Amino acid sequence: MTLWINGDWITGQGASRVKRNPVSGEVLWQGNDADAAQVEQACRAARAAFPRWARLSLAERQVVVERFAGLLESNKAELTAIIARETGKPRWEAATEVTAMINKIAISIKAYHVRTGEQRSEMPDGAASLRHRPHGVLAVFGPYNFPGHLPNGHIVPALLAGNTIIFKPSELTPWSGEAVMRLWQQAGLPPGVLNLVQGGRETGQALSALEDLDGLLFTGRANTGYQLHRQLSGQPEKILALEMGGNNPLIIDEVADIDAAVHLTIQSAFVTAGQRCTCARRLLLKSGAQGDAFLARLVAVSQRLTPGNWDDEPQPFIGGLISEQAAQQVVTAWQQLEAMGGRTLLAPRLLQSETSLLTPGIIEMTGVAGVPDEEVFGPLLRVWRYDSFEEAILMANNTRFGLSCGLVSPEREKFDQLLLEARAGIVNWNKPLTGAASTAPFGGIGASGNHRPSAWYAADYCAWPMASLESDSLTLPATLNPGLDFSDEVVR
């Protein structure tokens, strides 16, 4: 029984699904998808639970959410192993994900008060008040690269605001989704407040097509995000938050410490086996001898990165990709770039057949025409050389995406110029592209999102504002508008 609907674990009535460790092939989870009827059942449960959950005080809802944080802490080792085994991440990285989930609770509570709390302004004859109300029933679509942390970034603020939820994890990480749901169950969420439906495309389509849905919060690929946007077009009453990918540029200008710059680049491009939406996909490198030396060092250090299993000792920097198919897609993308005229500096290699262990790849594309503006979701870095900083900014902005952008340079003036001209929601200076502050919004423009950034701003799309003018008494104004006569004379 792998679906959680209205406070009960039930068996899915859809297609059967098996999840294996992407490196070893070990069977980790087996179950059945939710069919359309069960998706509707989850929606009815969420709708029925909404009035009571929304009427609770924030303090009462916060008690449950903080209890969940405590359960994350006490079950950290177990959840770390589940995420690592299911995604292929090394143990150390899965542990950082669980830590981020724990920290998200306090951050979301603070953000609720700052972004969507209550305000009151006194007026001569009363007061003006601002409150925020929950939307109702929200669907949360989770991704596979952070199967705990990223859905958590939607679920926690949505619950705090008083919404009820139908959560569909990625079909590639059903075990992690179920494990997190069981902790919410232990935290004491009332039946129907949070429901879990497992499944792939068919389940997702049934969920997004629900008429009684008040909103959908999505993290994933741009193509799917565009499909959801089209599906919900003409329904302005539904909130839609899309956090999608990026074809992210990292500009390496002047470098004082080559090894430090190489380390930053590897952290930007290859952490999580290149499976972060903010990962550097395009390296824009200044022409000249220093750029040549940097590139040679980057290739040399990257060549030493050997991906390993989640529990290998010593621990590897990167593990496997989410699946053998995902790893093969990266290899295919590299082969296509090479066929277009790209110059391979480091060829990506599958270490074993029927595994997702893939070494990083680096390919130079300077002067190659018609390079696709697509996100290759894996450890493949494309390199372009530039002559002037103005040219670098033009190259950085030459994408339909707009998630993250970074600059390595000792010159503050160049960063200030980039801040003015870059088209990206995250613009970093001498910091990895994959780094983001917990007290900042997270999202992009263009094909990277629909102007609904998450993280610190997630509270914004989890509630709607209600403005009020209030007075505890009613009296006739001392001065009336022209044409109003409240005298005692009888009009004949």
From Swiss-Prot:
Name of the protein this chain belongs to: N-succinylglutamate 5-semialdehyde dehydrogenase
Function statement: Catalyzes the NAD-dependent reduction of succinylglutamate semialdehyde into succinylglutamate.
Pathway: Amino-acid degradation; L-arginine degradation via AST pathway; L-glutamate and succinate from L-arginine: step 4/5
Catalyzed reaction equations: N-succinyl-L-glutamate 5-semialdehyde + NAD(+) + H2O = N-succinyl-L-glutamate + NADH + 2 H(+)
Active site per database record: E243, C277
Gene this chain is encoded by: astD
GO biological process: arginine catabolic process to glutamate; arginine catabolic process to succinate
Keywords per UniProt: Arginine metabolism, NAD, Oxidoreductase
E.C. number: 1.2.1.71
Binding residue positions for NAD(+): G220, R221, A222, N223, T224, G225
SUPFAM superfamilies: ALDH-like (SSF53720)
